[in-house]
A protein has these predicted regions:
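Beta-strand-turn-beta hairpins that frame and shape the catalytic cleft
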Residues: 2-11, 141-150, 173
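CN hydrolase (nitrilase-like) catalytic-core segments centered on the catalytic cysteine
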Residues: 70-91, 154-233
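Short loop/turn motifs at secondary-structure junctions and domain boundaries
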Residues: 99-103, 132-133, 201-203
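Amphipathic beta-strand/beta-sheet edge segments enriched in Tyr/Trp
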Residues: 104-122, 208-225
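Active-site glycine-rich loop that binds ribose-phosphate moieties when present
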Residues: 127-140, 158-161
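C-terminal beta-strand edge segments of enzyme domains
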Residues: 141-143, 192-193, 202-278
Length: 278
């Protein structure tokens, strides 16, 4: 007999938040969570959902941003997320702007089904308006009752090393709140990240919710213009270390992390092309 399935039901909020509208965005979250929390083990929001990813606004100021940033210890919204998680026995990944020690962070907070904060992730790769945030300095993984998960946020997915680190730390699922690019190229990226790491990736965006599986296939997808939740069950027994992960050659990859590696310092001059020869 084979191993019993390790089933996990994931709920992914697909809804477009309004910038600066914390009250209205919370109402969307609460309505959809109330509707679907009894169906899922984990519920995920898009990136910075609470403030509507206001960091990109042209009228952005630090003073305005401070008005929507949340302190994890003091925020009434965060406290309510914890209460909802405990009441429904649901793990929650909640995206918001965090104010911490004089800095702003693009944060994904992981709340356990007991209502306790399991941990949080600060976006590590910042581009464009995101430079108004401070950078995260870690790629943590978290143990939950069903298995081990990791989180990245939006643009972090552009760097393959980010999700590879999570997988090498034992993560079976990458939970990914996002707000930016979501077209077909992104679908290829997510399929590739899943395939090369033999894991599930849960891409949660205002316009689309997408789950890709260890074979690099689209496992589930929901795309529409109205608030909704993708609910889908995955079997974590499909996550293995066989195949290409087992055949890695890490002794050859030092150049990826070593800024002083000789191969990175070697000067390279591309060959000159004689345009007159054509």
């Amino acid at each position: 007999m084979g191993d019993a399935p390790r089933k996990l039901t994931i709920g992914m909020l697909k809804a477009m938040p309004r910038k600066w509208d914390v009250f209205g965005n919370w109402a969307i979250f609460e309505e959809q969570f109330d509707r679907h929390s009894n169906e899922v083990d984990v519920f995920i929001t898009p990136e910075c959902f609470l403030d509507g990813y206001a960091v990109t606004e042209k009228d952005w100021t630090a003073k305005l941003f401070d008005g929507v940033a949340q302190d994890v210890q003091e925020s009434g919204y965060i406290q309510r997320v914890r209460e909802l998680a405990k009441e429904t026995q649901t793990h929650v990944v909640f995206g918001f702007t965090e104010g911490l020690e004089g800095h702003f962070y693009n944060t994904a907070l992981l709340v356990g089904k007991d209502g306790k904060v399991v941990g949080k992730y600060h976006k590590t790769h910042l581009q464009h308006s995101d430079h108004r945030f401070a950078r995260g300095e870690d790629l943590p993984v978290f143990d939950l009752d069903f298995g081990r998960v990791g989180m990245v946020i939006c643009a972090d997915r552009r760097w393959p090393e980010s999700i590879r680190v999570l997988r090498l730390k034992g993560a079976e699922v990458c939970l990914m709140p996002t707000y930016g690019m979501w077209h077909v190229n992104n679908e290829w990226w997510m399929r590739t990240r899943s395939y090369e790491n033999q894991m599930f990736v849960c891409f949660t965006h205002p316009n689309v919710a997408l789950i890709t599986n260890p074979k690099g296939e689209v496992e589930a997808k929901l795309q529409s213009n109205v608030p909704d939740v993708l609910v889908h069950e995955v079997d974590l027994l499909r996550v293995t270390n066989d195949n290409h992960l087992a055949n890695r050659r890490p002794e050859l990859y030092g150049v990826l992390a070593d800024e002083e590696h000789p191969s990175r310092q070697a000067a390279y001059e591309p060959p000159q092309v004689d345009s007159s020869a054509s």
